[in-house]
A protein has these predicted regions:
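N-terminal secretory signal peptides and thylakoid transit peptides that target proteins
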Residues: 1-15
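Hydrophobic h-region of N-terminal signal peptides that target proteins for export
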Residues: 16-22
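C-terminal segment of N-terminal export signals and the immediately downstream linker at the start
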Residues: 22-42
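C-terminal and late-domain segments of enzyme folds
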Residues: 35-70, 78, 85-92, 96, ...
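Portal/gating segments that form or line small-molecule/metal binding sites
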Residues: 82-134, 139
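Catalytic nucleophile loop
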Residues: 125-128, 151-170
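Catalytic-core regions built around general acid/base machinery
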Residues: 141-154
Length: 257
């Protein structure tokens, strides 16, 4: 498959124009409801919680400073992507990671009313894990539309891995096993395109399995009007306002073309 390079990111943009063979039309998706977006909106979409041999989120200080500025926040943490282990342990891991940056982490599972917690949140972070479990549990808690509303109104948002995936219009370009069945594939739609976290180009020597490009090519064959950005580990998208999007990451991670 020919990869389409655009001026947003050299990480990998797979353009729908590259797949033009005839096929049956894809089933029409249920579109997200239009929502007003504040010019103060700030969204950080991170590919991963680690970069090379880093500790948990300890490479991302500059990314969080870009998102939060000098202000210190109490951040509502969404741990619902966690499958093996406990929310308590996940919360502690994220608390320890954010402590050097001066932010306080409180997990949504501490609150009796998750909807109220979202309505009153000053900032929101969504952790990685299994995207299918994450989306299913957010729908069960009734917070998908609430988070979308709050972030579009200007509440800062960060999400890594699965938490970055759900910033897209849908979860359809996750790498995860579909262990749960959400009522809809629709997610937050903070950006108008899909991302693929932990993106690695090419296959593994000695293995004959399909590559990440193969999987994304299938997506684009079936969804001709879509675009996908592959985000290598360490890379993030920083979105401000409606759709002003910048690629950020460690100095040796992929940058803009």
């Amino acid at each position: 498959m020919a990869l389409t390079r655009r001026n947003l990111i050299s990480a990998t943009i797979l353009g729908a124009a590259a797949v033009a063979a005839p096929m049956a039309p894809a089933k029409q998706k249920t579109p997200l409801k239009p929502m007003k977006v504040s010019p103060k909106r700030r969204v950080l979409i991170q590919s991963s919680s680690r970069y090379h041999n880093s500790g948990y989120l300890d490479f991302a200080g500059d990314q969080y400073e870009k998102l939060f500025g000098k202000e210190k926040y109490e951040i509502l943490f969404i741990p619902y992507a966690k499958v093996a282990g406990t929310y308590d342990a996940y919360e502690k891991q994220v608390q320890d990671a954010f402590k050097p940056y001066g932010h306080k982490i409180v997990s949504i599972h501490r609150f009796k009313d998750p909807k109220k917690a979202v309505r009153e949140a000053k900032a929101i972070a969504v952790g990685g894990g299994n995207t299918w479990a994450l989306v299913t549990r957010m729908y069960e808690a009734g917070i998908i539309d609430l988070i979308r509303e709050r972030v579009n109104a200007g509440v800062p948002y960060c999400g890594w891995s699965a938490g970055g995936n759900v910033a897209c219009p849908t979860l359809r370009t996750t790498n995860d096993m579909p262990i749960a069945e959400p009522p809809s594939f629709n997610t937050f739609g903070f950006i108008p395109f899909q991302t693929n976290p932990h993106f690695i180009s090419g296959g593994t020597q000695g293995l004959n399995n399909e590559t990440r490009e193969d999987r994304l090519e299938e997506f684009l064959w079936y969804n001709k009007d879509e675009e996908v950005i592959g985000l290598p580990e360490g890379t993030a998208l920083f979105v401000t306002g409606e759709y002003d999007c910048e690629v950020i990451g460690p100095k040796d991670s992929p940058k803009r073309v």
